[in-house]
Every structure is written in structure tokens, then in C-alpha cells.
Amino acid sequence: MDNFLALTLSGTTPRVTQGKGAGFRWRWLGHGLLELTPDAPVDRALILSAGIHGNETAPVEMLDKLLSALYSGSLTLTWRVLVVLGNPQALAAGIRYCHSDMNRMFGGRWQSFAESDETRRARELELSLETFFSSGQARVRWHLDLHTAIRGSHHLRFGVLPQRDRPWETDFLAWLGAAGLEALVFHQAPGGTFTHFSSEHFGALSCTLELGKALPFGQNDLTQFSITSQALSALLSGVEMSTSSSPPLRYRVVSQITRHSDKFTLYMDAQTLNFTAFAKGTLLAEEGDKRVTVTHDVEYVLFPNPSVACGLRAGLMLERLP
């Protein structure tokens, strides 16, 4: 199965759907779904996902290179792994999504969207994770969902962590720092993301990794993510990474800007970078007679997007943690 990406993009079913790699067994579970199981017993399970948005291709290329290293035997596998290419149709078309944003649909929220390929795929991925986690006895469960951002950022690589009732494990946060993430953003409320679903339903330590800017296949400079690729290789092979000398900055979400109607105006232009700072009292958005302003001394914007569909998030506002 050294042509997983090509098969996924073409929508082709392989003639052989299971086999042996170098020290592991593989099973093709469907388009964009590949299970890898080491020959030796392990108690660690990992979801490695990318391509939830079809125009975010750099992480897909990174996973393709990792799979090539595993199949060639140059990389040893020490986790049960489910590789997920989230939205094959959008990936093949080179667009963010075909109908609706899948990363708002998980945890059953797909039921509130008009039926589409994305709603069906979100349901399929939920079932795939349920099957994967229930079929093993993993003591450790991780989910790394790899993305790229629509716009530039003051932090080239950063992580977004779902709301979680229990404290985050230090080795997980340390690995994120070793993977080159410059900042970590902690959600304070549930959401429809893939990582919130895996964390809430299966107790996984989950993080959305944002790696640079969205570009078409073949136009990505993967060298700027070499530290993340090296960390993923070390993780898969069970090699401990040295901790970062400068730990990631930490932020928490303090509010969400939501577009409710066509009267919505976001006062940020296309050049506004993720993590741009705004002073207390700054007008961020208006919608009819409702005004959204900065309420803390300093807040930082994340994922500003004035053109989202009505009812969806047009941005997050953050505060720095000590």
C-alpha cells in the first residue's frame, strides 16, 4: 500500500486491501482510511489525520512521506495507527470543501447540516474512530489532526486543543513543543471539530496542528515543517524527542465572533494575521445594532473569516496565559 494517496485522490479501490509491511500489517478500510498494526503487541493507539479541508495539502504530503518511510522499512512502527485523509473529494478537487465545512460537523452535528458528501463522510469517520478504538486495548490514545491555515500567522506552526475536563498530560504538551509548535491555543467550550470528537468520545489526547498556509499539491515547501516531520517520525518509532528550549506560548479562547446574517461586518482585512493583537475597546465586528469589542486589556485574533456561512464562526479571540 505505497500508493495510498494516489488511490485516495483517484477514488480507486485497490485490488489487494490488506498485507504486510516492514514489521507491521496494513488494512485498507476505505477511501482515505488505512490501518497499520505492528507485529509486536503495543498499548498505544494513534489517529493521524489530514485533509479534512481539501485545499490544505502540505500535511497530506507529509503523511504520504511518513507512509513511504514505513513501507520501505526505514521507519519502525510502535503504535497502532489509523491514517485518515478526511475529505477525498475536496482533496481531488483542490477546494476547501464541496458543500459544507466538515470540521464543524463532528459529534453528531452533521445531522443539523443539509445532507451532503461531507455529512456522510463525517458520520463515516466517527464510525471509523469508534471501530478503531474499540478493537484494541490501548492505554494511550492520541489524535493529531494536521491542517494549514487560510491566512498567514505570527506563529508559523501552532496547535489548537479541544475543551477537556481533565488536565492535559505533560508528555503530550511536551511533544507538541518538540514538534516545533510555537503556540498552543486551549478551547474552553465544546465544538464540532474532529479533535473535540476524539477527545470527548474516546478520551484521546487530541490536537489540531496548524502548519503554515494552504497551498495546492506540489507547491508546498515541506522544509519549513521538517521539525514536525522529524517529531512524527520519532513518535511513530518510539524515539523520545528532546524538549523544546523555548516552550510554546499558551493562549485560551475568551470569545467567539459569529456571523448571524448578511448584515455582519468584520473589521479585519485580508492581511490581518492570526494572533494579531487588539487593545481593549477596539471594535472588531458589527451586525445590526450589535457591536463586538475587545473586553480584555489585549486580545489576539485567530481564524478571522468574514465570508463564513451564517451561523458559523467568523473568528476566535484569545488571551495570553502566563
UniProtKB/Swiss-Prot annotation:
Transforms N(2)-succinylglutamate into succinate and glutamate. Its EC number is 3.5.1.96. Zn(2+) binds at residues 53, 56, 147. It comes from the Bacteria. GO terms for biological process: arginine catabolic process to glutamate; arginine catabolic process to succinate. It comes from Salmonella schwarzengrund (strain CVM19633). SUPFAM superfamilies: Zn-dependent exopeptidases. It catalyses: N-succinyl-L-glutamate + H2O = L-glutamate + succinate. Pathway: Amino-acid degradation; L-arginine degradation via AST pathway; L-glutamate and succinate from L-arginine: step 5/5. The active site is at 210. Binds 1 zinc ion per subunit. NCBIfam families: arg_catab_astE, PRK05324.1. Belongs to the AspA/AstE family. Succinylglutamate desuccinylase subfamily. This is Succinylglutamate desuccinylase. One of its GO terms (molecular function) is hydrolase activity, acting on ester bonds. Keywords: Arginine metabolism, Hydrolase, Metal-binding, Zinc. It is an enzyme of class 3 (hydrolase). Its cofactor is Zn(2+). InterPro entries: AspA/AstE_fam (IPR050178), AstE_AspA_cat (IPR055438), Aste_AspA_hybrid_dom (IPR007036), SuccinylGlu_desuccinylase (IPR016681).
